[in-house]
Amino acid sequence: MSLREYAIADTCFLIDWARYRHRDVLFKVFKTVFVPEEVLREVKSEETIVWISRCLARDYLSLYTVSRYEIEEARELIEISRRIPQLPSIDLPEAICLVIGRSRGYIVLTENRGALYVPRLISRYSRVIVWRALELLVNAVLNNLLHVDCNEPEKIFYEYMDDTQHIFPSKAIKKALELVNGFCREKML
């Protein structure tokens, strides 16, 4: 995992991330995070709207106007996804983010399980990188952008879960902790 220039975020990611105490680390990992207009329309939480507005004003977030071709491809992706029984459903905002991730090389930020599986199950999207908040946190730690207490490395994940009420799968936390513990061991050498 390395630093990236651009990401595109969907609704579920932004709603959770807006509640996180270290949310500004997002803008240390990425130069710009794009937000499709379709995603903004879904946000109802006042806290999230205020945070997004401030970030747009500071040029940390940038509005992304989706082309009609991207909308059409996103609709096709939804149709394809509905034909794959093992793929949890995705809706238009997630599909738009995946389409833009594919065409522009942006990392897709989401908590949607269906969006996480698309690169594994649909070959056209196999090169799309999809991160949950968990991968973002690990990336921030590995690049020294988020301080980790190596005596309690799991604390960064539990802080996020406490702040957002979003629970990471235990298998995913275990894998993330292995990476962070490896980072801590290297730091001590």
Predicted ranges, named:
Residues 8-10, 110:
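Short hydrophobic beta-strand that contains or immediately precedes a catalytic carboxylate
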Residues 1-6, 17-34, 38-51, 56-61, ...:
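Feature 3881 marks metal-assisted phosphotransfer/nuclease machinery
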Residues 12-15:
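Metabolite-binding pocket within alpha/beta catalytic cores that recognizes anionic/polar moieties
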Residues 63-110:
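Ordered, amphipathic secondary-structure segments that act as subunit-interaction surfaces
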